[in-house]
Amino acid sequence: MFNIKPLSSEFEEAIQQKIDTKTKPLGALGDLEGLALQIAKVLGKDNPQINNPKMMVFAADHGIASSGVSIAPSEVTAQMVRNFMAGGAAINVFTRQVGLELEVIDCGVLQPFDSDSGVIDQRLGAGTGPIHKRAAMTLGAVKQGFEMAADRIQLHHQNGCNLIALGEMGIGNTSSAAAIMSVLTGVAASDCVGRGTGIDAATFKRKQMLIEQAVLLHHSELDDPMQVLACIGGFEIVQMTGAILAAAERGMLVVIDGFIASAAALVAVNINSHCRDYMIFSHQSDEKGHYLMLEYMQAKPLLNLGLKLGEGTGAALAFPLIQAAVNFYNQMASFEDAGIEI
């Protein structure tokens, strides 16, 4: 489905040598050095540059939300999308600060937006089915979502973009993400479920029960990652998964945000493991299962700020660190350049 090349180790030694001979002790820049190595392997060992980076926020509603798994009703998804378009959300503040161009994609919010809203229409439906009662969507919808996401990535790639950052908005989407995590990692559903938007103990218990119910209901159909998306996914999770795979196929870096985006990354890795090479995990969120999911994918996040918002906020906040890794690799003098003998 996606022809993703594993990263070649051909130039890894030369890249590491360039990092090691900068005017610093070996390893002194810590995790930035590993990040620079990854970026240079993806974008090229000679003067890699991040060009036309994009923050893509995917929005959709979830049928399970009507069963009371969140403090917020489903209507808040559309209200927050309008807030994004008005420039008033945290993701707007952070993308403006770090110089990321933001776009918002409607993958399946309950009510469609006006054509002049500025929201990109990639709707797969008006919210998913309630996953604890029936499948979220058809397999055809999953495939259509992948195609839509790939078309959007291709457009950005044609315009010179070589890095995308992923965010999301969707009341109820931590429930789908937790169910996906449980199925694909084997971790008990109860250990994947977090408080999401800050629910109370009774709501938390109901959320755990409904997710366990969803996993049990669909267990006979969950042996394929595409079917996992169809049974327990979300329209925005589908399109984030497609975007990851399409971007990796085109040799682009993909910055993963929090728990929901990481669930999409987990599905993508199960579809084609080579896409993992192109992912940068921006942060570990405060959501209960996120650190276990990151551990499963052998991902070391750049930040750990206790964030629990989504929207792409962690990915935006990590972007200056990604740029710093590029800049030190390209601009920092070597001992030889500086005339320093050790």
Swiss-Prot record:
Pathway annotation from the record: Nucleoside biosynthesis; alpha-ribazole biosynthesis; alpha-ribazole from 5,6-dimethylbenzimidazole: step 1/2
Residues annotated as catalytic: E311
Entry's Gene Ontology BP terms: cobalamin biosynthetic process
InterPro entries according to UniProt: Nict_dMeBzImd_PRibTrfase, Nict_dMeBzImd_PRibTrfase_bact, Nict_dMeBzImd_PRibTrfase_N, Nict_dMeBzImd_PRibTrfase_sf
Keyword annotations of the record: Cobalamin biosynthesis, Glycosyltransferase, Transferase
A molecular function (GO) term: nicotinate-nucleotide-dimethylbenzimidazole phosphoribosyltransferase activity
Family matches, as HAMAP family: CobT
Similarity section: Belongs to the CobT family.
Function summary: Catalyzes the synthesis of alpha-ribazole-5'-phosphate from nicotinate mononucleotide (NAMN) and 5,6-dimethylbenzimidazole (DMB).
Protein name: Nicotinate-nucleotide--dimethylbenzimidazole phosphoribosyltransferase
Organism: Shewanella piezotolerans (strain WP3 / JCM 13877)
